[in-house]
Amino acid sequence: MTAVTLFAIAFLSGLVTVHPAPQVANRTFEPVVIYDEALSVNALERLVKVGGRRYLIVYQDDCDKAAKSTGTIDIPALARHVAERPSGFPSDWAVLDYEIPFDDWIREGPGSAHWKTATDSMVAAIERMKSLFPGVKWTYYGVPRLEFYIDGKTWASATDAAKKAEIERQFQRYAPIIAKCDWLAPSVYMVVGDRSDGGRPGDLQQRETRAWTRAVIESAVDFGRRVGNPVPVVPFVSPVYQPGGGARNQAFIPSAVIDECTIRPIVEAGGSGVCIWTAGSYIVSQVTAPPPVGKAPDADITPVLRQWSEDLRVPESTLRSPDGITDLRRRFADATAGFAEKFMTVWAARRGATVPAPPLSGQPAPPRPSEPAKTAPP
């Protein structure tokens, strides 16, 4: 029986109380704004001005394609990939993104052989990363989770009993991993909207999204406290819609919707910041490149290009031109910077002065990684 299994058994033996979110007055962490890419000097200047920093994200396909079939992380391959990065670390925040089949296996819960395999591997991998790179704060993407739909109902319309049961299920599934993370990065991407209206959600959808976002952050804050690891909760967010709901994939989210459905509930629920992800450079490369000969255009990307063409009243060919590519990059850059600026504005209004974050281990903070970033800013 492994330490992870013993840990899980201990938490399964009656911990069912859901504690309230921390009060604003008890806030101890500085606000955190981290992002995947800036895409323009102007956006970079704006991000730096609000304290933004890039984070490192390691996707499983970067170094461990076999993990999709084994459900285990090749830790030596992961360590080599991170250690041999020519550009070093962009900051002291890092994310491991292992989703397939890890999400499904963890969803099976304690008692499942798949759950044990995936959980043991994820715990061992993050422990290894923390020992090799002690100046970096490590986490996993999407941990912990909370389902938007419960038994066919949205979070907002589900019963209190159903919500409580869902929260406890997720705690049981993720407790061993949460105990090892230096910060928690649940995903609160917006996926719900109306394709016929360019992805913009209606009033009801906005209220439902807001309620779910707040619950995700509150539960993550609570889970960290329950495992004795009250680390910052810095959720993954995006200025564009993500797949999984009715919204048009990769369409830009209106600023007012971001404010109401994402930023404010994060701050109000006790979140410590935002981890902004767009993959903008990849998306721009997809929507601006002609499809390969004999291959149909991407089913999700092409409608976004068409929508932009209609909104800007320019031909698709213009968007694919050098000037069009530059303009699309600027739009993603501005969306990232705007998200960061809005978050800091809401934080300042809600939280007031901040108190510096304590070292994660209770000891003097370790030095930053020795590998300085060598790449020029975008």
List where the protein language model places each region:
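Aromatic- and acid-rich polysaccharide-binding/catalytic face
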Residues: 98-103, 160, 166-210, 277-279
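Substrate-binding cleft of secreted/luminal carbohydrate-active enzymes
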Residues: 234-360
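Structural preference for beta-strand elements that scaffold enzyme active sites
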Residues: 29-33, 54-58, 91-95, 135-139, ...
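Active-site clefts of carbohydrate-active enzymes
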Residues: 142-152, 220-256
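Active-site groove signature of glycoside hydrolases
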Residues: 84-115, 144, 180-192, 272-279
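Boundary/entry segment of secreted carbohydrate-active catalytic domains
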Residues: 16-70
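Alpha-helical scaffolding within the catalytic cores
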Residues: 40-45, 77-83, 162-175, 213-224, ...
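Substrate-binding cleft/loops of secretory-pathway carbohydrate-active enzymes
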Residues: 144-185, 245-246, 250-254
